[in-house]
Structures are given as structure tokens and as C-alpha cells.
């Protein structure tokens, strides 16, 4: 486990938890003063944010533990479980928004002091935007699925705060149902984000292969190595920060065992240089045991 990965992932989880806690307190005050259903939706979403971010923080700490006798491949899959749990949290908040939005659509209420709600929403919008910017940078550096799930969650918050701002402004000018309509629209977007996040988490738990560009990069590395005649049965997956790469290398039949071993070691080191922290397993095949139609090919 790279120290930078652990540091960045932990800092992103802590930042999200701290921001969600602060915004929750601010939104409680704003909702009390305005009675806005959109702000109530934002308040509930902040409660979900705290639960999700705390879950994320605990799971990230667990996933960063090194492999042990009972978990020989490490604990990285915990990140996918965290993302799946987050999708459930977010789906619950979306359903709450639908119920509350429909209720206020048919029984609209006049907002009290919408100026307070607008001020609070502006603060929430810009602070969440800063958090998402930091999370996106962490995801680019670490490819952490847990942080990516959290980022998608807070991206929906940015959209929600923008919609709330418009709804409060319209309500201020007499469009009483705008508050409820925007709450319903926000609910649709949040539910979509939750389903997308859940799909990604399930795919990871099912050991989906690495992206095509990364698999092609693996082939590019080994095909440029002298002495390697071909490769097949490439299998890849990712668990937390660790990529798992397995493949069969095709070598000349007359190559001595020690030379074949050294060649495989060199290819492994080249792959580790391209994908730091990866777990690489290479099987050496004499060309003669490979079916004729597959010899000398570089198969993804």
C-alpha cells in the first residue's frame, strides 16, 4: 500500500465528514427560519451525507489494512461495499424527497424569510464545490472507488444546492410551487446518481476487468519485450488500490527454464513500473503447447 494513497484517501473522507456536519447545523437553522421544503430536502441530504461519509471513513480505514492470513488478497473490496452502501443511503434520501415534494406540490406553503435560505444555500453551494474539486483530484491520484462514490454524492449536492437557490428565488417572487417542483427534480437526479453508483460498485464486486486502455497498456509493455513470442489468457481486476494482472507468456521451446524464469521476472518488473502496486502473476508457456491459431498473438 502506497503511503500517499492512504494519506489522500483518509484526508478526503475526513474532509467530507467535517463539511457535512457543519452544513447540517447551518441548514437546520435555515429550515427553521424559512420552512422551505427544498431546504428540508437539503437538511435530510446532509444527514445522509454524514452517515455515508462516516461509513466511508470507517471502511476506508479497514480497506487500507494489509493482507492477512484470512484475507490474502487484502481488504480492498471493502471500498466497493462502501460505495454500494452509499448508493442505498442516497436512494433513501431520494425517496424521501419524492414524498415531501408531492405533499408540498398539492399543498404549497408560503416561505418565511427566504433571504436566510438563499444565504445559507450560497454558502453550502460554494463549500461543497470546493470539496468536490478536492475529491476529484484525489480520485485522479488514487482511483479510489470509495472516494469516487463520495464525490458523485457531493456532486449531486452541488446540483441540489443550485436548484434550491433557484427555487427559493422563484418562491420569493410568488411562485410557491417552484419549491416542491425543484425538490422533485432534485430527487430524480439523486436517484439516478445512486443507481449509477450502485452499478459501478456491483461491477467491482463481480471483478470486472480493468478498462480497455489499461489492458492495452499491459499488452504494449509485454509485446515490446525481446524473447516474448506472444501472450494470452490475460485476466485483470481491481480491489481497492490494487490491480491484479494474470497472463500467459509464450516463449521459445528451447529456452532454458532459468532464462524463461528471468524473462518472466523482467516482464513482471516492467508491468510493476507501469502499474505501481499491482499484483502480477505470469505463467510461462512453450510456443508448441499453444494452439496454432493463437500462437504469436497478443490477446486482450
UniProtKB/Swiss-Prot annotation:
One annotated GO molecular function: cadmium ion transmembrane transporter activity
Topology relative to the membrane: Multi-pass membrane protein
Any single biological process term in GO: intracellular zinc ion homeostasis
Subcellular location as annotated: Cell inner membrane
Transmembrane segments: 12-32, 40-60, 82-102, 114-134, 155-175, 178-198
Primary site of residence: membrane
Annotated keywords: Cell inner membrane, Cell membrane, Ion transport, Iron, Iron transport, Membrane, Metal-binding, Transmembrane, Transmembrane helix, Transport, Zinc, Zinc transport
Similarity remark: Belongs to the cation diffusion facilitator (CDF) transporter (TC 2.A.4) family. FieF subfamily.
Listed PANTHER family: CATION-EFFLUX PUMP FIEF (PTHR43840:SF41), MITOCHONDRIAL METAL TRANSPORTER 1-RELATED (PTHR43840)
Function comment: Divalent metal cation transporter which exports Zn(2+), Cd(2+) and possibly Fe(2+). May be involved in zinc and iron detoxification by efflux.
Protein's UniProt name: Cation-efflux pump FieF
Provenance organism: Serratia proteamaculans (strain 568)
Gene name as annotated: fieF
Amino acid at each position: 500500500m502506497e503511503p500517499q494513497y492512504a494519506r489522500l484517501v483518509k484526508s478526503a473522507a475526513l474532509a467530507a465528514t467535517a463539511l457535512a456536519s457543519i452544513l447540517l447545523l447551518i441548514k437546520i437553522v435555515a429550515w427553521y427560519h424559512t420552512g422551505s421544503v427544498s431546504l428540508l430536502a437539503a437538511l435530510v441530504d446532509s444527514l445522509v451525507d454524514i452517515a455515508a461519509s462516516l461509513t466511508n471513513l470507517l471502511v476506508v480505514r479497514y480497506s487500507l489494512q494489509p493482507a492477512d492470513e484470512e484475507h490474502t488478497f487484502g481488504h480492498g473490496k471493502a471500498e466497493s461495499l462502501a460505495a454500494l452502501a452509499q448508493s442505498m443511503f442516497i436512494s433513501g434520501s431520494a425517496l424521501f424527497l419524492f414524498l415531501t415534494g408531492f405533499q408540498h406540490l398539492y399543498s404549497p406553503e408560503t416561505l418565511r424569510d427566504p433571504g436566510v435560505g438563499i444565504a445559507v444555500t450560497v454558502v453550502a453551494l460554494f463549500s461543497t464545490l470546493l470539496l468536490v474539486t478536492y475529491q476529484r483530484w484525489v480520485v485522479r491520484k488514487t482511483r479510489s472507488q470509495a472516494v469516487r462514490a463520495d464525490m458523485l454524492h457531493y456532486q449531486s449536492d452541488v446540483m441540489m444546492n443550485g436548484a434550491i437557490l433557484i427555487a427559493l428565488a422563484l418562491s420569493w417572487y410568488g411562485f410557491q410551487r417552484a419549491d416542491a417542483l425543484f425538490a422533485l427534480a432534485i430527487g430524480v437526479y439523486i436517484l439516478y446518481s445512486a443507481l449509477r453508483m450502485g452499478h459501478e460498485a456491483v461491477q467491482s464486486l463481480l471483478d470486472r476487468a480493468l478498462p480497455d486502455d489499461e489492458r492495452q497498456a499491459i499488452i504494449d509493455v509485454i509485446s515490446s519485450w525481446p524473447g516474448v513470442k506472444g501472450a494470452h489468457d490475460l485476466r485483470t481486476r481491481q480491489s481497492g488500490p490494487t490491480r491484479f494482472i494474470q497472463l500467459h507468456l509464450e516463449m521459445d521451446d528451447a529456452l532454458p527454464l532459468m532464462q524463461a524464469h528471468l524473462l518472466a521476472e523482467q516482464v513482471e518488473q516492467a508491468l510493476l513500473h507501469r502499474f505501481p502496486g499491482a499484483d502480477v502473476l505470469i505463467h510461462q508457456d512453450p510456443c508448441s503447447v499453444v494452439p496454432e491459431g493463437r500462437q504469436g498473438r497478443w490477446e486482450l
